[in-house]
């Protein structure tokens, strides 16, 4: 992943959701980016809107990269990045105007559990951007742990939220992005196999797992970004 900056959610999609719903009114907004990765979303939001960003990730190398990008975009004074386990750290975080859950998977549980856990960290009028996906009607059996569209909406409602806007990811974009990512991964795997021939089987196993994941995303899942607010 060292070749990739945008390794999760699309900053452009998230910025459109913010603009479309008037969340960019006022530069004093406090934003919490959980699982911020290398800071692609955080840095862009700080640069475009002047938001105050708190990004958290468990990978030290990712946080170092995020700080580097913040310096490059001249928004270091607006961005604070932290190495921490979000499952633990979340308990002490309060009063954020916007929380971003950008493709973090089930680190905090399913969608309902995740939203329940972040709710206490929101301000009274705070919103959540959730970048996830749901299972399409047809798919292999190992996808049945993923919710379908209706089940996602049920989980959102049970957690005490409602949808302000839903952005469906375009399959051609997903395919293009996956091809780009797989190209980088393939290149690095070959380099690592040369450097560490005794671990060749581990790198090949990782590559195969990534290919399977890529196939699932392209053919059996619908990637979605939701803007959510508390239910009345």
Language model: regions and residue ranges:
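A short acidic, Gly/Pro-enriched loop at the edge of an enzyme's catalytic core
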Residues: 90-99
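Conserved alpha-helix/loop element of class I SAM-dependent methyltransferases that forms part
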Residues: 8-27
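A short glycine-rich, Lys/Arg-flanked "PGG" loop and its adjoining helix->strand segment in the class I
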Residues: 112-127
